[in-house]
Amino acid sequence: MIIPVGDKTIELNAVDGNIGVLLSGGMDSLLLLTLLCDNFDRQRYVIFTIDKADGSTRWTEKILDYISERFPTNEFYQQIIKGGDQDEKKELGVSGKAGFADVLINYYDNLGILYSGNTMNPPTYFWHNTDAPLRGAAVAAAEKFEKFVTPFAHLDKSYTVKLAHDNLYEHVFKMSHSCTERPRGRCGVCWQCNERQWGFDQNKLMDPGKN
């Protein structure tokens, strides 16, 4: 199915078999999971979370409690994946390189499709104290692995904020955690904190989230 967002569109597809979703606890992966559940009923979702220092497992546990109650006719199974070293997280943005490789090696063949909420970086510079993620690696992986899909790869954060806002997905803002430097709250100066704020600023919206 095709979903419009501003001057662009995204495409989502249900398949026979398990639907895999990489869920980091961040805004974009939560938005993607919500869109899938909202549009495809009675599916079996296998949720992969890379266990990293940013508190990913803590936030995704709360997210899945909420999502499973909101969409009770779907089935959800979470698989916690060991992440790689701290310097690997920039390789794929929302996923550690080692953790993503684990998913491909051990789970990919049993999935009908594997979704990632990976987005493109904003077309601007803002001051930050951490490296910007090299998100092109996820695009390259999608070209190599047929069932690995990145429907947001052509969108930056301004579009995903708009998509969540237009669909009244307030929980996407309130429950997600974007900061990579603190497992709770926000440092306000890392690249991901700045990216998130930029997305809201482009839409002239206030961010209701505090995680």
Give short role names for the model-derived ranges.
Residues M1-N211:
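Nucleotide-activated chemistry modules centered on ATP-dependent adenylation/adenylyltransferase
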